[in-house]
Each structure stands twice: as C-alpha cells, then as structure tokens.
Amino acid sequence: AETTLLPWSEDLDVSTFPILVVLGGDGTLHNVINSLLPYDSAIPLSYIPCGSGNDFARGVGLSRNIDKALHQILRTRRPKEIQTIHYVEANQEEIGLATNNVGLGLDAAIVEKTNESSSKKALNKFKLGSLSYISSIIHVFFKQKGFPILVEMNGKQYTFNRAFLCTVTNHPYFGGGVSIIPTANPRKAVVDLVVVERINIFKILWLIFLLLRQKQGKSKHFHHFQSSKIRIVSTIPQTIHADGEILGKRSIDMVYTTQKRLFWF
C-alpha cells in the first residue's frame, strides 16, 4: 500500500500520522535527507542509528541503542526542530544538506581512506569499525599537506595559508564520537567552523592531548568560528565529504547556512 508523507501539523492525529524511519548510519541518513530536499521541509523524518559512527545520534540526544531509539520514536507526540547544514557550492552549482559535518582536508581524506578499506565491513560486523578509522588516520596523517583557504563571515575575511583540517559542523561530534566543538548546538541556527593549521608532529600530539581534555581552544593553531553564514574558498583541490559521503576532490567556493528540518524521536 502506498503511504504519502505529510507535512507536520499540530491538528493531525498522531496515531495515524505517517513517519519515514531511516535505519542505517550517518551516510544513509545523509542520502535520505537529500532525497527529501525538494519536498516540504515540514515533513518529519525519524532515524534509528545502525552505523559505525552514529555522530548525528550523539549530537541530538538520540539513543544509539536500537531498542531504546525505537522506544523514543514510539513515545514521541510531536517532532523536534533540528538545524541541518545547508551548503551551496558555486563552482559546480551543487546544493545539499548535511546533518553532521562538511569537511575538506584531513578529515575528508581519512573518510575516503576508511571507505576504501577492505577490512571496514568485516570490522563493523564486530563493532570494531573504529580500528579501521584509526588505521586510516595513521596512513593519511603524514600524506596530507597544508593548503590555502579563505574564510568569509560577518563581513570579515580570514586567510589561512596552511590549513590542515577544515570542518563545518552543527553539533559537537565528528569522526565517530570526537567532541571537536563541545558548545555546538544543533538547535541553534548557526554553523560552527574549525580550522586546524598544518604543524609539526609534536604540536599535533599536544593538540590531540588538549582535544581529549576538551581544551583545544588553548592551541593557537586551532581556530573556531561561528556564524549564521560562512563562506569558504579553496583554490587547491582537496577531498571533500559531507556526513562521510565523498563529494569529490576539487577546489571549492562554498557557502554554509542552516536549514530547519523536523525529526521524530
């Protein structure tokens, strides 16, 4: 039987209201929400996290336990408003949504390497997907070079000649549970940008130590920006990802804002 997805309204009967439930990881959720992009943004979407990272679930307070997540969904009576990242890339006229992060440089290269790993699926079956991710970090870390970027926000421009990691996020987590911006809030209509400069291994290790203690802001090589609209220009081609889905390797001129979507949990 066909079911028509409907925009949410307070006067609708909750017991008969149709809900699309996504089962999968962050990449699956990314693909579904972008498939719904042309439709009414008031159509609610539900989600049961079954992936290896499940950063969206962490970021919005949805249980990563399948049974508990289902219980959250069943007892819900109205959807929650979550701000997603809306990105527009001028060079290729590309438009999309991300529920977690959009990154270029190191994190995108790590994601690409992990996705190429022949051991990823096998490790995920035993809930050891993080081992594949760690292996990719070690492999990519020494190969990733610094690259120039221009950041534009609030009428100001910031130039980084040797960016190493550049990530736009709407909640605290990336990389399967790393709290890179503890203050990021997916219910606020702002995006957070992190830029880490290319530095030597000893300074990187110190930055990782600070990151584990959530004191990364003390490093002068760690830069955090927040705004309702951020533009990033990179003239040197870099690997780009959105929610762990590789968008390609290219130069970009990308503008990031937020778009409110309804989630049922």
What are the residue ranges of the model-derived segments?
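ATP/NTP phosphate-donor binding region
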Residues: A1-L23, T28-S35, Y39, D67-L70
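Short glycine-rich anion-binding loops that position phosphate/pyrophosphate groups of nucleotides
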Residues: G25-T28, C50-G53, L104, H171-P172
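Short, well-ordered alpha-helical microsegments
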Residues: L29-H30, D107, K249
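Short glycine-/acidic-enriched loop or helix-start segments at secondary-structure transitions
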Residues: N31-N34, A57-R58, A109, G177-V178, ...
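Catalytic core of DAGKc-family lipid kinases
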Residues: Y39-S46, G51-N161
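Glycine-rich phosphate/pyrophosphate-binding beta-alpha loops
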Residues: G103, D107, L165-I180, I246
